[in-house]
Design a protein with these regions (language model features):
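Bacterial N-terminal signal peptides
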Residues: 9-20
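Carbohydrate-binding surface patches
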Residues: 249-252, 256-274, 291-295, 353-389
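Solvent-exposed beta-hairpin/edge-strand motifs
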Residues: 386-402
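Extracellular/luminal ectodomains and secreted, surface-exposed scaffolds of diverse proteins
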Residues: 404-412
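C-terminal helix of von Willebrand factor
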Residues: 327-351
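Glycan-processing catalytic domains of CAZymes
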Residues: 24-318, 322-330, 414-417
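N-terminal secretory signal peptides that target proteins for export/translocation
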Residues: 1-7
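C-terminal beta-strand-rich structural cap/linker in extracellular carbohydrate-active enzymes
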Residues: 321, 411-437
Length: 437
């Protein structure tokens, strides 16, 4: 068998692992709540989100020529009319009924895609430092060498994508300061960059709130604030690239549950340990083609036809891990799942990257595999990756680097390579065609 033939065979095997299509870019809307906003020329963006409670801010933003999304709490949707017209759209936060949302669209004569509903439960992504736990009433602080706890939204986005296939979830969250300086000054530049990169890496849209102090510094024209905004805008542009092809997540682990949020922490740790998965309900077991999957994690027990499908999956060589008494330690559970998969069935492996999360995708129209990489520590870090498949070319791009060729090698049906300095986020493209062609 030639190398090219072997490569095509591995690619076909990889293609069987893909699930439903999703976005690998993010529509990030900037939230501005000061009464005045800089001009579009200064910010370099055309659309902003303004709180509906600040009528003067809405009017001023419209007068500046922005396309304005007005933010309204779900409790106030019924009968809401924004100050100033015309508004470009509405962002609803909190809980609102489908009937209230439909009524809002009709009343304001807005198309469905301009009335956006932000999902609750999201967190500003960051690494928790000095994580404190209690053991036998004794407080214990993690050491610097311990696996850091990453607050992230990867699992939440996967759950939301499963609940509404084909629709991109919209997240928003508030900044949670840790130190006194963060209360006064707000997030650092890197916190903004990680937030943008996370949305673009895992297929979510985002309303990005700018801290009050940062907005004031931009209005005052401070040089440092302008410099930081230029970098934020570069990340906005990089992750807003609307690819003509909707990539599909590459997964070979299915999580079976009717109540995913009950099991959120279990899935959160799977995502944390870079185990790509998709969420399936027990009912879907009876109708889905499960050949693509290598392992099913059964959190809610199936019945009837779904149970028969599970038995067929096992007879066909699939692995099943049933949870019958809850998951007391999600972290250990994630390690157990990685071990159960084995090295030969992992889609992606990563070394030297305890603060890095990845997401593999496959183009349905070409032979390209795309892997997003995100370093929550925002410190340049050499990261080694192993991706299933023997690819002829590996390219890397990021907001900080132009597209470049990455040296790679093949080993046991996988392609291995090193990203020498992953600062925040980027994309790796793996294709069958060699770099010189």
């Amino acid at each position: 068998m030639t190398i090219a033939t072997a490569a095509r065979s591995v690619l076909l095997a990889l293609l069987t692992l893909v699930s439903s299509a999703t976005c690998v870019f993010a529509d990030v809307l900037v939230r501005w709540d000061q009464t005045q906003a800089p001009s579009k020329q200064v910010l370099g963006i055309t659309t902003i989100v303004v709180p509906g409670a600040n009528a003067d801010a809405v009017r001023h933003a419209i007068a500046e020529g922005y396309q304005v999304y007005v933010e309204v709490d779900g409790a106030n949707v019924s009968g809401f009319t924004p100050a100033g017209t015309p508004v470009h759209g509405i962002v609803v936060t909190g809980n609102a009924s489908d009937a209230d949302i439909a009524g809002l669209r009709t009343r304001l004569k807005l198309p469905a895609d301009r009335v956006l509903v932000a999902q609750s439960g999201a967190k500003w992504p960051h690494i928790r430092t000095n994580w404190v736990t209690k053991n036998n009433d004794v407080l214990q602080v993690t050491g610097r060498s311990a696996q850091p706890w990453i607050e992230n939204n990867a699992a939440l986005l996967r759950i939301l994508q499963a609940e509404r296939p084909g629709r991109t979830p919209l997240l928003t969250y508030r900044w949670q300061p840790i130190t006194r300086s963060e209360i006064d000054e707000g997030p650092s530049l890197e916190h903004y960059l990680v937030a943008i990169a996370e949305a673009g890496s895992f297929g979510g849209d985002l309303v990005l709130p700018l801290h009050e102090r940062f907005q004031q510094r931009l209005l005052a024209g401070e040089a440092a604030a302008r410099s930081e905004w230029i970098e934020i805008r570069r990340y906005l542009e990089f992750y807003s690239k609307d690819f003509p092809t909707r990539y599909r997540p590459v997964v070979n682990v299915g999580v079976i549950t009717s109540h995913p949020m009950v099991w959120f922490e279990t899935m959160n740790l799977l995502a944390r340990h870079n185990v790509p998965f998709e969420v399936l309900t027990p009912v879907q077991l009876a109708t889905r083609d499960l050949k693509a999957l290598r392992l099913l994690i059964v959190l809610d027990q199936p019945e009837g036809a779904a149970l028969d499908a599970l038995e067929r999956f096992t007879r066909g060589g699939g692995k099943v891990h049933k949870v019958t008494a809850g998951v007391s330690d999600p972290n250990s559970f994630a390690f157990e799942i990685r071990k159960l998969l084995g090295a030969d069935d992992r889609v992606v492996d990563i070394w030297n990257g305890i603060t890095v999360l990845i997401a593999p995708y496959q183009s349905p129209d070409t032979d390209t595999v795309l892997v997003t990489v995100l370093n929550y520590a925002y410190q340049p870090l050499p990261v080694q990756l192993r991706v299933r498949g023997t690819f002829g070319a590996v390219h890397y791009e990021s907001p900080d680097n132009r597209r470049e060729i990455v040296p790679h090698q093949h080993r046991h049906g996988y392609t291995e390579f090193i990203l020498p300095a992953l600062r925040v986020g980027g994309r790796v493209y793996l294709s069958q065609r060699s770099a010189g062609r």
